């Protein structure tokens, strides 16, 4: 749970982009061209910050900077804000600078001025250039950004949004997530005019109250994720040293259309702890393959994870069916316990095996015996609140039985963050030791069954 009065050290709103950081938080807008390009709503961010000070007891400040004035150190400008109406592009040097800044813990917010399609298209194109390996994806309603302060499941739009063809009442926010953290966010419809306080029905925008609530949530989320991002970065560096460690038994992470890699360090860390815990002279080589690739049959275990909804092609489903029916094990987890992936995974596996059930694995199963005797696991604070305040609970793994052995093992709660010893503040997951023990036991099961 994030303290609702937490102060973000510094906010920098750039005229080309905008930044947020901490103490008596200062923000900055980045300057480029004349005011019409970056400052059509000059009081937008300031109004939001002033309202936050009076209504949610959060103290932020803002300043305006050019991109060249933005520090690559997120401690100096933790959040950047960029708004506009027209096409734009970064230079290769700016893209490299932004990528490093974002991976080191920074965050950038893009606001489409009056729902501008040219500006939105430019953001989508540039983020693909900056993060070719991680697609921009629309956030579903259970994402922590929509619940970090207010519960924002539904919003109010202007008539112009309806005339543009959008009929929903949920917020339309897209993001690039790295290691379970939003690093870049784009609002498809304009938030800034709502913060400014004046909204006309022929503008593609959120109504003021909805814009304010979304803005508060975004900044509260950014604040709570700052310190955590440092730990996640350290875990990634540690994982880099582990890649060459294993070379014997292949474990394959499933690649699919969407964000299939939510954590970069967790799996390698867990694989190393398995060797240390068991003393078994088996090293794991980690591969990343699509289900349609023949190489999956060289791996006794497939690992699959994600945050949001996904779909597999009929070819991928047929290949996965063949793999499991021939003795392979699919181990999947809903990273951070996100409900979008949970629903999609259950629908997918049921469509492949309609006559079978994904049942909860009983506590007396061998799966919970070796190499760790597991009767209960610790949970994250988010999951604790759902279980009536219990800090520990029986492990919840689900399995699909194939002739006396599990061909599918699934966790609806996040494990990978625990493997990295850095669960997200918003995760519905298992704590560090519990996640490692479950992961080790699943690996042992795959080797012995």
Regions found by a protein language model. Name each.
Residues 3, 7-11:
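Short, low-complexity intrinsically disordered segments enriched in A/P/G/S/L with frequent Arg
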Residues 6, 79-120, 301-342:
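Short alpha-beta junction capping motif
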Residues 11-12, 20-25:
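Cleavable N-terminal signal peptides
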Residues 24-79, 83-87, 191-192, 198-301, ...:
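Aromatic-Pro/Gly-enriched surface loop or interdomain linker
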Residues 26, 32-36, 46-47, 117-197, ...:
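An acidic, glycine-rich "communication" segment
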Residues 56-68, 110-114, 133-142, 228-234, ...:
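Surface-exposed patches in mature extracellular/periplasmic domains of secreted proteins
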Residues 71-76, 101-103, 176-180, 243-246, ...:
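Extracellular/periplasmic catalytic domains that process cell-envelope and extracellular macromolecules
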Residues 78-82, 107-111, 136-138, 183-186, ...:
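Structural recognition of the beta-strand scaffold that forms the well-ordered cores
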């Amino acid at each position: 749970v994030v303290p609702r009065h937490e102060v973000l050290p510094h906010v920098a709103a750039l005229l080309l982009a905008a930044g947020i950081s901490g103490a008596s938080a200062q923000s900055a807008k980045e300057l480029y061209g004349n005011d019409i390009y970056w400052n059509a709503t000059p009081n937008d961010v300031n109004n939001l910050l002033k309202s936050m000070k009076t209504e949610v007891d959060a103290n932020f400040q803002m300043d305006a900077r050019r991109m060249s004035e933005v520090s690559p150190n997120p401690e100096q400008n933790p959040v950047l804000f960029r708004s506009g109406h027209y096409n734009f592009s970064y230079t290769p040097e700016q893209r490299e600078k932004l990528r490093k800044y974002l991976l080191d813990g920074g965050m950038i917010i893009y606001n489409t001025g009056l729902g501008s399609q040219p500006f939105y298209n430019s953001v989508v194109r540039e983020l693909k250039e900056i993060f070719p390996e991680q697609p921009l994806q629309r956030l579903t309603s259970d994402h922590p950004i929509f619940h970090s302060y207010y519960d924002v499941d539904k919003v109010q739009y202007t008539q112009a949004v309806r005339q543009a063809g959008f009929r929903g009442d949920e917020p339309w926010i897209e993001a690039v997530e790295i290691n379970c953290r939003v690093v870049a966010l784009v609002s498809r419809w304009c938030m800034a005019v709502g913060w400014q306080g004046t909204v006309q029905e022929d503008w593609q925008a959120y109504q003021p109250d909805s814009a304010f609530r979304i803005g508060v949530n975004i900044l509260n989320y950014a604040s709570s994720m700052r310190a955590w991002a440092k730990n996640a970065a350290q875990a990634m560096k540690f994982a880099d040293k582990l890649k060459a460690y294993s070379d014997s038994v292949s474990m394959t992470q499933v690649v699919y259309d969407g964000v299939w890699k939510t954590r970069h360090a967790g799996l390698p860390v867990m694989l190393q702890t398995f060797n240390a815990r068991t003393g078994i002279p088996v090293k794991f080589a980690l591969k990343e393959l699509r289900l349609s690739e023949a190489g999956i049959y060289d791996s006794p275990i497939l690992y699959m994870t994600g945050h949001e909804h996904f779909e597999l092609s009929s070819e991928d489903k047929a290949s996965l069916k063949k793999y499991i029916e021939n003795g392979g094990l699919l181990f999947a987890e809903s990273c951070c316990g996100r409900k979008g992936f949970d629903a999609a995974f259950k629908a997918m596996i049921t469509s492949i095996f309609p006559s079978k059930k994904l049942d909860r694995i009983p506590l007396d199963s061998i799966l919970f015996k070796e190499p760790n005797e597991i009767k209960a696991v610790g949970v994250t604070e988010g999951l604790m609140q759902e279980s009536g305040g219990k800090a520990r609970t029986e492990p919840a793994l689900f399995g699909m039985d194939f002739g006396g052995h599990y061909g599918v093992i699934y966790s609806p709660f996040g494990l990978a963050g625990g493997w990295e010893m850095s669960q997200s503040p918003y995760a519905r997951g298992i704590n560090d030791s519990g996640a490692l023990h479950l992961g080790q036991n699943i690996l042992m099961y795959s080797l012995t069954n």
